Amino acid sequence: MSKLSKQPPKIIVTKMGFDGHDRGSRVVAAYLRDAGMEVVYTPPWQDIHGVVKLATEEDADVIGISSLATDHLLVPKLMQALREAGMGDMQVIVGGIVPPKDEKLLLDAGVAQVFHPGAALEGIAVAVRELAAKARSLRRDKILTK
């Protein structure tokens, strides 16, 4: 077993754009931390390039975006910026108020999963663990094929 696979999943929990309502993201971040994950929690109002930079610096497995208003519409641009930075294997989840038409847009852009209000915290934790394992596997494969 590699050293990387023994480390707990690492997730960045953030809010992009002008949405400052952070109660939900704080609850999720605390639950994930209590579940043994390494959580990097940012203040609200992050921009796309700041999130990409932080994901690179932190060597995160998953990025969790919280959205109460329409700031989830920035996520397709985040996905593009991640691909341009060579981080196309980054697993991204979105949680919050996301209308069905926007959910399709996010999934089509490469978001791994969308969680709606009332989603079970345990289910979010399971998804983050699975997505972290997937991200690590994709990174290993990328290294081995170079």
How would you describe each model-predicted region?
Residues 1-42, 53, 130-138, 146:
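ATP-dependent carboxylate/acyl-activation modules
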Residues 25-131:
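Cofactor-cradling patches in redox/metallo enzymes
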